[in-house]
Amino acid sequence: MTAATAGIDDVKRINDWLDGAHPSDAIRWAVENVTPGRLIVASSFGPTGMVNLHLLAQIAPQVPVAFVDTLYHFPETLAHAERVKAHYGLDVRVYRPAASREAFEEMHGERLWERDLDLFHRLTRVEPMKRALQGVEGWITGRRRDQSDSRVALAHVELGDRIKINPLTAWPSEDVWSFIRANDVPYNPLHDLGYQSLGDQPLTTPVSEEEHERAGRWRGTERLECGIHGLT
């Protein structure tokens, strides 16, 4: 199945089925229905992404994993990414906006996010993700309904230019962490320090128990998304 051949009725039927299924079923469905070689997993190695990767390693370890290294991640995030690659042996492909932070800042200046946040995210996140999606028919993400108000109606399968699969959309954070602990899934140590959703180091803060897990991203602004998931 491709985005060109899938219909609205197909997607509704699949979503109805996945509402009562395990996330592994969504990953198997993607592997079996997207053209071989044209499916990827997009991951920044957050908690939900780690559940996806744990399941992927069991179901279809040949599927590539696309990681956007913005050049501004926490050092702990980059170290965690290396541990994950070694732990699961997955085909992790890294996409960057430039060869190094120094090269990026030579082109665009320092602290671009303070001058133009939209441009900063377009250059460091959206453009690298566009490259990762070239030739891709389907991509698996780690988005969930309870992550923020902007995701409360998120379906398991979305139809756009490509098919987007969100295996854990219905899982609350508690279920994600229960799975991580029960299966010894590696996770970023910053989560133990109150960081729930990890983005760029200059733009990310810890959150309180009362807040959405993405409340620490772009604190003090009304922004909820970086722009990657505007890509379909």
Placement of each model-derived feature along the sequence:
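Nucleotide-activated chemistry modules centered on ATP-dependent adenylation/adenylyltransferase
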Residues: 1-232
